[in-house]
Structures are given as structure tokens and as C-alpha cells.
Amino acid sequence: MCHAIEFIETPLFTRQIKQLATDDELLTLQRELIAFPDKGDVIQNTCGLRKIRMATGTQGKSGSARVIYLLATREIIWLVLAYPKSAKENLTEAEKAQLKKLTALLINEV
């Protein structure tokens, strides 16, 4: 049986994704996460954040954008960050520490 998934965007994600992707590209990502919510790789030391590749424009997934998300419950996915791969390959330990704090806040929201 299929269940509904609610996507909640952080304000930062909303600003970032508008610069990176079209509405259709974001919809494609959301459909992918509905089908496979745990598809993204877990990012160590962030309390469960995941990173997934997202195709944008004419670039494939490997060279385009990265989306950081939190599978908070079976019904709620927080879209936290989006950035071009060319700007950043991996998060720094300091960024992970900040995201870990944010993750705790987001989990308490649901």
C-alpha cells in the first residue's frame, strides 16, 4: 500500500534550489524519494542526514547538484540543503556539526 510523503523545505533549501533546478527537476527528485526514501547515502556524524545526487539542466546526476535531506519519519522528508557539485564535493566536519544541531531541531518538529 502506498502512503503519502510530505516534503518540507528549509528556507535555505528553497533559496538554493531555485538557483539550481527547475520545478520539473525538483519534482523528479521528489518522485525518486517517494519511491526510494532511503536512497541517499547517510552522511556520518549528522544524526541521519542523507545526500543524494540530482540531475539539473543538461548535466547528469554525477556532475550536477547534491541535495541533503532528512527522512524524519516514514511520512516526512525535510529538504535541507542543495548545492552544485562543482562548489563542494563533501561537507566539512564543521558543517556536519552545524547540520547535526539542525537535524535535532527538525526531528523535534515532527
Residue ranges and their predicted role:
Residues 70-110:
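Enriched for short, Lys/Arg-rich terminal
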Residues 9, 25, 29, 48, ...:
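Amphipathic alpha-helical interface surfaces
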Residues 3, 28, 35, 48, ...:
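Sequence/structural signature of beta-propeller domains
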Residues 39-83, 87:
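Basic/aromatic recognition patch in beta-strand/loop cores that engages polyanionic ligands
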